[in-house]
Amino acid sequence: TEVTRSVQMYIDEANAEGGINGHEIKMITYIDGGDPAQAESVAEKIVQENKAMIVLGNGYSDPATAMGKVLAANNIPGMTSGATAPSVTEGNEWFFRVINDNTAQGSFVAQYASIFFGHKSAIILYEDNSYGSSLAVAFDDEFSAHGGTVFSNSPISSKSETLEKDIADIINSSEEKPDMFFLATYKRSGAVAAIYLQEHYPGIPVFGGDSLGADSFAAVVAEELGKAKADGIIDGIYAPAQLIFDVASERAQIFRDRYIKNVGEMPTWFAATSYDSALVTIKAMRAAGISGDPSQIAQDRLLLRDYLASIDQRSEDFEGVSGQIYFDEDHNYTQPLAMGLFSNDKFISAPVQLYHISDNDLPDDYLEKLRSGEILRINRQYFGRTRIIYVGIDINEFSELDIEGDHTYLADFYLWFRYEGEKIDFEDISFDNSVAPIDLGSPTEEKEIGNGHYTLFRIRQNFRNTFNLEDYPFDHHSLAIKLRHDTLERKDLIFVTDTLGIGEITREKTLDNLDKAHAFETISDWFPVTGFFFADS
């Protein structure tokens, strides 16, 4: 599973660094089947065996809650990387969560829909369990607080044999049609609902919960359609995600590359957060001073629990794939959720994202900005807006490589920008590592695509990077092309990888594209070993 693969990835890395005080870290695998009763049984088995320092995983809320009660009663820490219902950690001093809960998620989607889109009415369909109901309640409360009206808030079940009819009956029972639909569902019920809504109400926007916020949702939709692909039927559907790789950091790109190499498939945000759960746990074990002595396991568990609870602010010491991990008073990690949308069956970052604003950085007029929607408040934390610009590079050639002298190289490439909203002043874009300032000049191509803009440039310029020759003849060097906006900070604007334009951006695919373009043909004695596109911090 994604959990075991990701956790084992970090365990292998940690063991390569000496484990925990010289002790090797081992993973014991249990399967709860996504069922609360089975999860409770598994937890009781863990208690009886008395080997586990902590329990990681728990992708579903009801099983996680059931397991957490048993673990807490026996003073065993637990940490979920996927279960989002508030009940998972509420009142449980032994359970932690490395993602946002549904209170934060529902509030985020409601504010995004009402503030950024101006939606004033909604119909909610939710999974008939704690995940769906808590997400629906959070959305309903926040949407109503912003002056919205919820026409109906109804449960559906992915196990229903008449699911499509159930959905149709709910929608048809409403006398008025809403500005939007919100699907707080699992993937299968969400797929059936999305297909029905897109076929019968194509003009009404659809938002989903984080269960829908992944490329894998498109695969489930295709399966429901009986096709190989979803054929764009879910294009335009918005959903939040704990992490979207096209807007993520270099650390996230490295994780994705390693995961693909180890597993052979693209990771989801759940894989990333599962990796983070292992990272924060093992680092906490090292810092807490646990003995590793089986006879002291009860004391070690308490030390670990207490140390995890003490990680109550952002720190580079616990920086994972999804950011700097910490736990609030409810043992949740509240970070800026990413909002994505489907385009050509791919889940990509939406044109507007959020960034965290600390209490110390709140402007004096923050109350006014809260009312205007410039600042959002989610789970007692504040967030501002960030504009997203999709950027793509197509390398034609690297040449004139000077390793020992000026550390320069000539790059010939196409550069494009795809974005919505106000037009960009390209004079404000510069290249940090170009030998001489680059004037982009007139674009090679410029056109409107749907609601957005597309601008293409051809560039042939010299760039410079620092080359460390100490490891010669086994040295590795980076041929980087770094661009930024001169006047706007990252919190205002982020350049992200245009996965729609570039296509697959795995290490292997990137190298294959460079090889097909003969990009290194004129550089002798060197060959490419990796390639990344990422938004640097």
Set out the residue ranges of the language-model regions.
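Extracellular/periplasmic periplasmic-binding protein-like sensory domains
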Residues: 100, 194-275, 287-292
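Hydrophobic alpha-helical
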Residues: 61-72, 178-200, 280
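Short, well-structured alpha-helical segments in soluble
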Residues: 33-53, 111-112, 162-177
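Signal peptide-proximal N-terminal region
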Residues: 5-27, 144-147
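Extracytoplasmic ectodomains of secretory-pathway proteins
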Residues: 305, 331, 340-380
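Extracytoplasmic ligand/sensor domains, especially the bilobed periplasmic-binding protein
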Residues: 5, 37, 51-161, 203-239
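Segments of small-molecule ligand-sensing domains
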Residues: 261-271, 283-347
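Non-transmembrane, solvent-exposed beta-strand/loop segments in proteins
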Residues: 364-404, 409-537
